[in-house]
């Protein structure tokens, strides 16, 4: 049975998730939606663990059984410490397929454009996770909305990558501060020895996701 063989092949891979959560009034709803999507896609069952890096001090409820929770000490909104945890893990574990994503939009009031952007990103890295890990047999990283300037990155900072590639990233991107630091965490994915990206859905460079509600009819039939 081809489906059984495919499922067995997927389950034999080591899958790890690194998820960043900035706590505020909106983040609880985003968190619940994203965890639900991990379950319904089958990814939560397939992964070995999900590292949840939290900025904030509120107690977490409804945690997945596979969750490894870390309350970040530097209480900045950006993903720095969660990315750092992922980087250190990759240095020690070179044979994993790693998903990185975050509670996009949690640091702002509800903005329809950001909600639509998050739905778009989640569709590719969560709903289509099997395709992503298949692509990692050919490429070092997989995502959507690839941008090459000012440094190669996936706009929005949701992606999959091989941990042996993540281990080669430039760790200086972890420690810059201020607004440039937040941007550097997103740019870090392109700083490795051999950035060989797979862009699952190209979005025209003139498309500003902060101004546009990027609806599902733009991508669901891919």
Predicted regions and their residues:
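ER/Golgi luminal nucleotide-sugar-dependent glycosyltransferases, focusing on the catalytic module
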Residues: 8-222
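Short hydrophobic targeting helices and cationic amphipathic motifs
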Residues: 2-4
């Amino acid at each position: 049975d081809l489906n059984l063989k495919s499922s067995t092949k997927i389950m034999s891979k080591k899958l790890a998730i690194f998820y960043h959560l900035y706590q505020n009034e909106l983040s609880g709803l985003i968190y619940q939606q994203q965890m639900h999507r991990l379950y319904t896609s089958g990814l939560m069952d397939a992964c070995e663990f999900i590292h949840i890096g939290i900025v904030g001090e509120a107690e977490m409820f409804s945690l997945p059984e596979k969750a490894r929770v870390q309350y970040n000490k530097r209480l900045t909104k950006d993903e720095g410490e969660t990315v750092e945890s992922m980087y250190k893990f990759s240095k020690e574990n070179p044979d994993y397929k790693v998903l990185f994503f975050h509670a996009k939009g949690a640091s702002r009031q509800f903005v329809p454009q950001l909600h639509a952007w998050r739905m778009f990103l989640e569709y590719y890295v969560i709903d289509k996770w099997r395709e992503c890990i298949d692509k990692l047999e050919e490429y070092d990283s997989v995502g959507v909305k690839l941008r090459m300037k000012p440094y190669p990155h996936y706009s929005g900072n949701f992606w999959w990558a091989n941990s042996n590639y993540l281990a080669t990233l430039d760790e200086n991107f972890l420690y810059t501060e201020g607004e440039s630091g937040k941007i550097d965490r997103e740019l870090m994915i392109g700083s490795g020895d051999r950035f060989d990206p797979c862009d699952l859905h190209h979005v025209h460079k003139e498309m500003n996701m902060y101004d546009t509600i990027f609806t599902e009819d733009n991508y669901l039939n891919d």
